[in-house]
């Protein structure tokens, strides 16, 4: 019995002294491909899911008065890492398609005055968009988080196969609006 106990203790000690192995999902960086023409999004989705809840940093129309807008192509997945403001968080994105599509069901939390237009990237104060910093951005498989700095709203996103889930944490002394 003593030999079995010693073998068990040695195996247990060896197992406990092994470095903790990273989960495979810890090795994934969803930010890769979100700049330039990578056409990927940093938000949350589940494998084979029908929703991909993610931030949209701009909405450039394909054409204005019948004239094609080349910059629309940059926003195929709705997000460009180079941008410093967010227009909202939508539930449908394609990754790597090279064609602008989806971006449906856009939600944007805010405090203060209701604004109908998104404004421009050059002048975020001209609409409802909010500035953000990549320093507050967390993107990992199935989860996205960012702080909207204009209204100090913490946004957390996750997804199941059929549902996009948003959690907004507003400043305690501000009116909560969506």
Regions found by a protein language model. Give the residues of each.
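Bacterial Sec-dependent N-terminal signal peptides
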Residues: 1-23
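Accessory carbohydrate-recognition regions in carbohydrate-active enzymes
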Residues: 22-178
